[in-house]
From Swiss-Prot:
This is Probable uridine nucleosidase 1. The active site is at 248. One of its GO terms (biological process) is purine nucleoside catabolic process. It is found in: Cytoplasm. It catalyses: uridine + H2O = D-ribose + uracil. It holds the Pfam family IU_nuc_hydro. Gene3D superfamilies: Ribonucleoside hydrolase-like. The gene is URH1. Its main location: cytoplasm. Involved in pyrimidine breakdown. One of its GO terms (molecular function) is purine nucleosidase activity. It comes from Oryza sativa subsp. japonica (Rice). PANTHER family: INOSINE-URIDINE PREFERRING NUCLEOSIDE HYDROLASE, URIDINE NUCLEOSIDASE 1. It comes from the Eukaryota.
Length: 324
């Protein structure tokens, strides 16, 4: 490549609840040559929103990018009430109980929804959002600006379980369950949405051998990540009998930058917001012509990840995490 040629970098906001696999993803994204992170926005999920903000600031500092703005998001789901926080998976600090020193940088004054709306309006058609937690902030941005859905380039969502069991109940996956109303707003907004569910992400994992390979690598953040992953790994062993970790968030980031490693099906997706199936994601694949209108009628289809090329995704994740 000629010295005057520049790699095109796609503008990206990561909406995140760091979180151990979020931390892996954020540090990966900062190393990815085709991505320009223009901000992090924070949400509850793996930890509280307040904790997530501190962790996002810490991760930007650790990545060598303290200038990247961090905007704090909603502390609770759209309908209010206590947020569901998975501290039993990610530790009480969200980072595997490493209890790191506080960041020196500060969050910006805008809240997450304001930040998203402003950036997407500043760069219409150029900004993608990688949503790694409950979708409250993205839904608030859509509600705040009726043109947001048409101006955002793409929203890639980690969430849902499609024709598969959930991970917080037989019906629901954690991010969607964390704010089902918000997820339904995002999925029916008319935006260009790709969803990567746990039926895909649980196919891609780091075994204990992979974690050891990472620890022994010259990766810039390898030791830090492996220290953090110990808590996450021990939870997997205890809860699932699995000796390793699922790479939910890194797989979703890979779907953003390497969609060719996945196949997608298009269909309208609705989210159940009440009853025993709260948080359930159900897609109309368009296989049947319905005789009458139903709650799926009239909405723009979104893309749901259907298959994944596991070896290529793993190779990409390792390449970024093990780069010196």
């Amino acid at each position: 490549m000629g010295s005057n040629e520049q790699i095109h970098r796609d503008k990206l906001i990561i909406d995140t609840d760091p979180g151990i696999d979020d931390s892996m993803t954020i540090l990966m994204a900062f190393r990815a040559p085709t991505v320009e992170i223009i901000g992090l926005t924070t949400i509850f999920g793996n930890t509280t929103t307040k904790n997530a903000t501190q962790n996002a600031l810490l991760l930007c500092e650790r990545a060598g990018h303290p200038e990247v703005p961090v905007a704090e998001g909603s502390a609770e789901p759209l309908k209010g009430g206590e947020p569901r926080v998975a501290d039993f998976v990610h530790g009480s600090d969200g980072l595997g109980n490493l209890f790191l020193p506080a960041p020196t940088s500060k969050k910006v004054d805008e809240n997450a929804a304001e930040f998203m709306v402003n950036k997407v309006s500043q760069f219409p058609g150029e900004v993608s959002i990688l949503a790694l937690g409950p979708l409250t902030n993205v839904a608030l941005a859509i509600k705040r600006d009726p043109s947001f859905a048409s101006k955002v380039k793409k929203i890639v969502v980690l969430g849902g379980a499609f024709f598969a069991a959930g991970n917080v109940s037989p019906a629901a996956e954690a991010n969607i369950y964390g704010d089902p109303e918000a997820a339904d707003i995002v999925f029916t907004s008319g935006a260009d949405v790709d969803v990567v569910g746990i039926n895909i992400t649980t196919q891609v994992c780091f075994t204990d051998e992979d974690l050891l390979e990472l620890r022994n690598s010259k990766g810039k953040h390898a030791q830090f990540l492996c220290d953090m992953c110990q808590f996450y790994r021990d939870w997997h062993a205890e809860s699932d009998g699995f000796h390793g970790i699922f790479l939910h968030d890194p797989v979703s980031f890979t779907a953003l930058v390497h969609p060719e490693y996945f196949t997608f099906k298009k269909g309208v997706v609705r989210v159940e917001t009440q009853g025993i199936c709260t948080g359930h994601t159900l897609m109309d694949q368009g296989l049947k012509k319905w005789n009458s209108e139903n709650p799926w009628s009239g909405y723009k289809p979104i893309s749901v990840a259907w298959t994944v090329d596991v070896p290529n995704v793993l190779a990409f994740v390792k390449e970024l995490l093990m780069a010196p």
